[in-house]
Amino acid sequence: MKTPFEKIRIISCILVIVSTNVVGQKCNGGANCIPLEECTDLFQQLKQGNSPQLTRLLRGLHCGFEDLNSPKICCPPEFLARRSAFSSAGTNSNPTSILPNEKVCGIQNNDRIFGGIQTEIDEHPWMALLRYDKPLGWGFYCGGVLIAPMYVLTAAHCVKGSDLPSSWQLSQVRLGEWNTSTETDCVEGDCSGPVQDIPVQQIIAHENYDPNDKDQQNDIALLRLSRNAQFNDFVSPICLPTSNELRQNEFESDYMEVAGWGKTETRSESDVKLKVRVPIVNREECANVYSNVDRRVTNKQICAGGLAGRDSCRGDSGGALMGQSPKANNWYVFGVVSYGPSPCGTEGWPGVYTRVGSFMDWILSKLEQ
């Protein structure tokens, strides 16, 4: 039960946050205008402490007052996920309602340094590390991205790949990490909160993925977490390309970004999250390159990189190829790191990524409340 002081503190905070907003705005994206306290996950985050990101979010969601002391907000469906889990079972009839909308997904607040190798402490807050338990310990050997409070997108080869030792068990996902060698990450007084280590409840690899397929078709998987991730400045979801425009875009002549710790099944490169900008490569050109080693690149894959030393070497196996929306600057995941040349970063040999847009129907079919 909340103490009177706690309730007054929360309500006072909200009144300050929303007082500049227009009351009575309509809700978009399947959200409902309800009292803040009924938007359970968001209310719990506010009780844990306010942040600039949470302030901006609440300002954008405010839609009126129940009474003088009860502000109402357009509660995004993802913040009702915990409550819904007890009232529904099985496949969700409207899976897109589980996905965060553009007021929540793909947003980062740092002043980014373009061309840098090391990320800022709160850059790409959707990046995830996959923890594997081994007979003699544990370690992080793949990556992924948070796409919803209870879902991480990764590569199928990270959960059933031919290089994955049978004695390893994927057990947890870590969110909110920046430097794996320190307990608390701080840069010039800006400190992240504690990391979120969340057990994996269910592993969902694409049914048509074959670990022994050298072309690595259908190399995509989802991880359902045992509980909701708590969104903050260092943990938030990336957007998925749900629109037909983004699903079908070839992105030729564009640059995208790969980030991660350089962790794969066979190497562990960096303690600190790294990034690199890579050019999108014409698929026909990419297919011609890989035909020299008898590998087939299809329209369900996307190629990027091919610059000496600047490939997905800095990304993680199962991590993301990311780009920003030209309309709203939100970040989207367009590719999942699948395979590339050996040695990594060989000039003229781009990395190959699973095209997320080609698997949106599959992703949506697997999402449950």
Curated annotation (Swiss-Prot):
What is the enzyme's main class? Answer: hydrolase
**Site positions for Cleavage:** 83-84, 112-113
- Cited SUPFAM superfamilies: Trypsin-like serine proteases
| Tissue-by-tissue expression | In larvae, expressed in the fat body and hemocytes.
What residues bind Ca(2+), as annotated?
A: 177, 179, 182, 185
Please summarize the record's notes on activators and inhibitors of this protein: Inhibited by (p-amidinophenyl) methanesulfonyl fluoride, p-nitrophenyl-p'-guanidinobenzoate, D-phenylalanyl-L-prolyl-L-arginyl chloromethane, leupeptin, antipain and to a lesser extent by antithrombin III.
PROSITE patterns recorded:
CLIP, TRYPSIN_DOM, TRYPSIN_HIS, TRYPSIN_SER
Which intervals hold domain Peptidase S1? 113-368
Q: Which UniProt keywords apply?
A: Calcium, Cleavage on pair of basic residues, Cytoplasm, Disulfide bond, Glycoprotein, Hydrolase, Metal-binding, Protease, Secreted, Serine protease, Signal, Zymogen
Q: Name one GO molecular function term.
A: endopeptidase activity
Glycosylation site positions: 179
**Post-translational modification (record):** Proteolytically cleaved for activation. Cleavage produces a light chain and a catalytic heavy chain which remains covalently associated probably through an interchain disulfide bond.
Which Enzyme Commission number(s) are on file for it?
Answer: 3.4.21.-
Record's Pfam families? Answer: CLIP, Trypsin
Spell out the CDD domains in the cross-references.
Answer: Tryp_SPc
Q: What induces it?
A: Up-regulated in plasma in response to infection with S.cerevisiae and M.luteus.
PANTHER family assigned to the protein according to its UniProt record, in alphabetical order? TRYPTASE-RELATED
Similarity comment text for this entry? Belongs to the peptidase S1 family. CLIP subfamily.
For this entry, the protein name equals: CLIP domain-containing serine protease HP8
